[in-house]
Amino acid sequence: MSPRKPRPWPDTPAPLSAPVVDNHTHLPTHAGEIPRREGVALSLDEQLDRARKVGVTALVSSACELPDFDPMIDIARAREGVRVALAIHPNEAALHAGCAEPSPDGLTPRVCEHHVPLDEALAAVEARLGDPTVVAVGESGLDYFRTAEPGRQAQKESFRAHIEMADRADLPLQIHDREAHDDTLAILGECASADQRIVFHCYSGDAAMAERGWYASFAGPITYPANEELRAALAVLPRELVLVETDAPYLTPVPWRGCPNASYVMAHTVRFIAQLWDVSEAAACDQLRANTQAVYGSWW
């Protein structure tokens, strides 16, 4: 058996030519969430410091489980450049509805104390949307990879509610869409208003879906060699609809795939997009930052 490949925290990349924003990440709300690799666990503030040094000067951190709402808002209040997206994650929505059947991937979900009835959880989201640190509703949507059939109805109910509350609050909506493209698009067509700012976070659709006119946020997977469909989607998207994100601590871009992810590592994804666009790094950064401002406004 070959020795296990080391998966350290990525080195800090060279600074970008212009500042950018991580449109979707998950900052650790508790120290125990930070992975330790080769004896190193980068603290929240060290992750943010590295991000600033490479030019990722602001970020939107998604809290999509009830216990994380207030800690994430507190983090944003105390740290320059950090803003928050709030929602009940689709997999959480099923648990709030009491659906804990084994999922298609073989895992059995665990209902916890914080899984209050779904209507109470949704009310907790809406009650916090007026906080000045909250700039988006998200991530909400559908996830058929991790949820069995009974839970999918709860996901649909939750998704509709999030679309409506984002519209009422005049906030953009970050969408989680995993193996559920058709139903996600159907519900958007049914519930979303014509001028809603809709962002498909960690975009996973194809070129045809990219032509529908919503924002698409690309994460590390666009750098993976097998993901030609993602690159085809980027090629047909108007550049003013393209955003960039990490979805950290997941989906680390090449050349650090498999290692822990954080906002500072997004520089690799930005440079990859610049190459695909065949523009200078500075031009790509300026375009991505302008797109972010069009969706969320500016706080940096």
Question: Which positions does each model-derived feature cover?
Answer:
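Mid-domain alpha/beta scaffold segments of enzyme catalytic cores
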Residues: M1-W300
